[in-house]
């Protein structure tokens, strides 16, 4: 099973038809059907490692200021307590099994509503531990590698470049900032060269990196996918582009 990082961008993509969402739908049509999905979303960024372990995760509308139509979207995919337990096992038994607090946030459902619109594949979310450094997340993700051979699609959902302070709201065709394009290109180069060290220590890559990822939450899901890459395995970029000048919509497929 491949592992895929999705640049999810603006929540409005959930109810939009554009080049990004059409590419997401094409991914869903062409990859093997997974038994279940494990998603690491930028929007479950908390002080601890947890997994959703309920039978029926709720759809979380974790945003404000958007049209009512977006708040009416539901993604009623089942959960998978079995997958939650398997993740807990792989991670050493110290994971919080969340039975009722979280659910599926828009980092997950705004993409999956296009990739698997029937919402008939079980979905589990894994939180991002906000108190740990990037290396922790990369190392933790490596322990999830057996899932790929068990028919589980591992997804990271965030954005390699994500700076809302400079985002041109309502100007989806805005030219990307030079620093955003440079960091996006640098990340691609490092990914293609299997040079994950600088991507883990991304803050040391200079001003472009600090502007592109001013907070870690949207960047870290990328590391969960890169950590699952095997030697000599193909990496592709099925979705490319920028939104609002400072959000990279780049997606990364491993395998």
Task: Specify the residue positions occupied by each region the protein language model found.
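Conserved beta-strand scaffold positions in the cores of enzyme catalytic domains, especially
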Residues: 3, 37, 123-125, 154
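Long, well-ordered alpha-helical scaffolding segments within enzyme catalytic domains
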Residues: 23-30, 136-150
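A residue-level signal for conserved active-site and pocket-lining positions in enzyme catalytic cores
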Residues: 40, 87, 126, 158, ...
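Short, well-ordered beta-to-alpha junction loops that form the rim of enzyme active sites
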Residues: 41-43, 102, 157-160
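Internal, conserved structured core segments that host functional sites
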Residues: 83-138, 143
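Surface-exposed, charge/polar-rich loops and edge strands
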Residues: 121-122, 130-132, 139, 146-153, ...
